[in-house]
Amino acid sequence: MPLLDSFKVDHTRMHAPAVRVAKTMTTPKGDTITVFDLRFCVPNKEILPEKGIHTLEHLFAGFMRDHLNGNGVEIIDISPMGCRTGFYMSLIGTPSEQQVADAWLASMQDVLNVKDQSKIPELNEYQCGTYQMHSLAEAQQIAQNVLARKVAVNKNEELTLDEGLLNA
């Protein structure tokens, strides 16, 4: 099985919260697709609670689009990582890490402004596969943590995993 790009970075050196360009690719039509690693937690030290990350998934996707889409950028998808330390965001375009960080911080403020669990989008059995597994309070605690710590930038060249550690 091929070694995926996400496993070629040293998770012991990652900062969080932090944004990282995980991958860029060019489509046959010439569009650039950029995948960002939006790391909310320090790997192997912190983890996002399951109800909070699920609620954040519902809120974050819309709020990030509000703040980042436009001027050659269109978000394709924002999905939580299986390790529950962050999200991957795929988009058309090449915004800077700072633009992404600014949109992320603005989105976290938006999460704090949600007044009631009933305001979580798609919170019903028809649009959500686990609609009862939500916590606005946990999502807001995650948002508060990001706002308090700010968003750094993780650079790939600083995180390259030593080949001797591969498959260790």
From Swiss-Prot:
Q: Which HAMAP family match?
A: LuxS (MF_00091)
Q: Where along this sequence does the record place binding of Fe cation? A: 54, 58, 128
Q: To which protein family does this belong?
A: Belongs to the LuxS family.
Keywords carried by this UniProt record: Autoinducer synthesis, Iron, Lyase, Metal-binding, Quorum sensing
**InterPro entries tied to this protein:** LuxS_sf, Metalloenz_LuxS/M16, S-ribosylhomocysteinase
Subunit annotation = Homodimer.
The protein's name in its UniProt record = S-ribosylhomocysteine lyase
Q: How is the cofactor bound?
A: Binds 1 Fe cation per subunit.
EC number of this enzyme: 4.4.1.21
Q: Which residues form a coiled coil?
A: none
A Gene Ontology annotation in the biological process aspect, one of them, is: quorum sensing
What is the top EC class of this enzyme, as a single word?
Answer: lyase
Pfam families assigned: LuxS (PF02664)
Query: According to its UniProt record, which cofactors does this protein need?
Result: Fe cation
Q: Which reaction does it catalyse?
A: S-(5-deoxy-D-ribos-5-yl)-L-homocysteine = (S)-4,5-dihydroxypentane-2,3-dione + L-homocysteine
Q: Which molecular function terms from Gene Ontology are attached?
A: iron ion binding; S-ribosylhomocysteine lyase activity
What biological function has been recorded for the protein in this entry? Answer: Involved in the synthesis of autoinducer 2 (AI-2) which is secreted by bacteria and is used to communicate both the cell density and the metabolic potential of the environment. The regulation of gene expression in response to changes in cell density is called quorum sensing. Catalyzes the transformation of S-ribosylhomocysteine (RHC) to homocysteine (HC) and 4,5-dihydroxy-2,3-pentadione (DPD).
